[in-house]
Every structure is written in C-alpha cells, then in structure tokens.
C-alpha cells in the first residue's frame, strides 16, 4: 500500500537538504511525498503557530522542477495546512528536515524542525526529525553558497526510517542527528537528550544613535555524558537516534504528588 508522507522543514522551501531527502525517500519507497515548507527561513522558532496574521499557500517549483507548497508561516503552520488543506488527511508519516545544523539536547524545544515533527505527532502521524551537524556557523546561513553535501545524510535517514517500517512506531517523534563526517557505514547509537547543546552567549553592540542592541549566540558544548545525543554526535561521531514523546510530564510525578498534593 502506498504511504503518504508529508515532508517539511524550517530552513525554507528551497533548501537543498529538503530536496535531497525528498528525492531519496521518493526513490526508495512506494510513497506519495508531499512537500509543504516555509517560504522563508524559520530556524529557532520552535512549535510556534501564526495566530495574528493570515497564511497563504503558494504552489512552487523546487530545483528539480517537482511541485511543492510554500507557506507564509512557521514549520508548524506548514504541518497544520499540509494536513488540513493540502492532503486533507493525516499522512502516515511527517518527516522534518534535513535541517542545516544539529538539533540536540533539551534545546530541541527551540527548533522549528522538531516543532514541525511534534505537530505531526500531535495530529496522529508517525514523525521523524533529521538534522546534519554543521560546525561552521556561516554555512548555516548561506546554504546556497556553501559546499554542504546532503545526499549521504538523506541515505542515512532512509536507512534509519526503514528500521521502523512494519513495526508499531516506538514513540511520538524519532530525532535523528548526523555528524558532518558521516558515511553510510557510520554507527548508529540510540541516545537520550543531553541537558544542553550550546553555552549561551550575548553580544552587545552599539548602533549609530548610541543605543544598545544584542546578538544571541552560543558555543558548542562538548562535555556532556556518554549516552547522550550531544556526546554521540560531537565526541564519538556517531549517528544519534533519540526517541521523544509529546508528554512533558516530569518523570517523578508520583513523588511530586506524595510530597506536595496535601499542601494544596
């Protein structure tokens, strides 16, 4: 039976990572792959939705002349409109990526790539998010001018994806992160989220009118514990596969109840 796959991202409809994944998935599987992605770069926007402005869907041609749908909103908007207006049904899978830059640790809550995947899971689809490590920041923001090679990552994602076909999906979202030196033979490691991916840095500058403004930046964390996604990708140079859930309830719920319930 032909699968329905909704392919989204947060880097924009014309991302080469999106195109590489579409082509590899489309060639490998009996699937209808529908691309619905933001008109513009939406990195760092998390699972935000547009509530105070209308959204538009524009049919467009990708670099390989195939058809896609550009949405004037966030990655989560793309999933919502992709399901309710383009497909008019919940697909079998929502796949988000390939993101330019890794999405690791608890900072995944800021990721538009993960936001889209969680929205797909929220609608009842099986969801995967996939990201490629990029160690030079300027490559993240000048994709069209950079030598980033996505085909290997797309094939790795395909191989991971195949492991779940025919089985009951193991979690709400599977988060896949690929190191920048990976090959199709790079080991795959099942991991947990690290506490953090970056050490935050705020840079203050002064504009021509002597007013302060700020750039937010971060330095990559390397010293997370073994078994985490950060350690797997940055230290061991393995592909990281992390099972994620929509349920953000603290693991110590019973202990919390026992300690605090009588105080309310």
Swiss-Prot record:
Domain of life: Archaea
GO cellular component: cytoplasm
Listed GO MF terms: 5'-nucleotidase activity; metal ion binding; nucleotide binding
Enzyme nomenclature, EC number: 3.1.3.5
Keywords: Cytoplasm, Hydrolase, Metal-binding, Nucleotide-binding
Subcellular location(s) of the protein: Cytoplasm
SUPFAM superfamilies attached to this UniProt entry: SurE-like
Cofactor: binding comment: Binds 1 divalent metal cation per subunit.
Function as written in the Swiss-Prot or TrEMBL entry: Nucleotidase that shows phosphatase activity on nucleoside 5'-monophosphates.
Family: Belongs to the SurE nucleotidase family.
Name of this chain's protein: 5'-nucleotidase SurE
Species annotation: Methanococcus maripaludis (strain C7 / ATCC BAA-1331)
């Amino acid at each position: 039976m032909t699968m329905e796959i909704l392919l989204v991202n947060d880097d924009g409809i014309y991302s080469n990572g999106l195109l590489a994944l579409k082509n590899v998935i489309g060639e490998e599987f009996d699937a209808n792959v529908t691309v619905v992605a933001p008109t513009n770069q939406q990195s760092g926007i998390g699972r935000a939705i547009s509530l105070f402005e209308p959204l538009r869907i524009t049919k467009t041609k990708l670099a390989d002349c195939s058809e896609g749908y550009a949405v004037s909103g966030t990655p989560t908007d793309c999933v919502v409109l992709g399901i309710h207006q383009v497909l008019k049904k919940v697909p079998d899978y929502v796949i988000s990526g390939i993101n330019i830059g890794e999405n690791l640790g608890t900072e995944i809550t800021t990721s538009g790539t993960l936001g889209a995947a969680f929205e797909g899971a929220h609608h009842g689809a099986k969801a995967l998010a996939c990201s490629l490590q990029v160690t030079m920041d300027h490559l993240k923001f000048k994709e069209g001018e950079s030598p980033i090679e996505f085909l290997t990552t797309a094939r790795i994602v395909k191989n991971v994806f195949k492991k779940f076909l025919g089985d009951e999906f193991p979690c709400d979202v599977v988060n896949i992160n690929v190191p920048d030196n990976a090959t199709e033979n790079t080991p795959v490691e099942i991991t947990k989220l690290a506490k953090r991916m970056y050490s935050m840095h705020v840079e203050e500058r002064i504009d021509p009118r002597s007013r302060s403004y700020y750039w937010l930046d971060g330095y990559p964390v390397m010293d997370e514990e073994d078994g985490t996604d950060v350690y797997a990708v940055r230290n061991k140079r393995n592909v990281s596969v992390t099972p994620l859930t929509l349920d953000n309830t603290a693991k110590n719920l019973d202990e919390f109840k026992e300690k605090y319930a009588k105080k309310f």
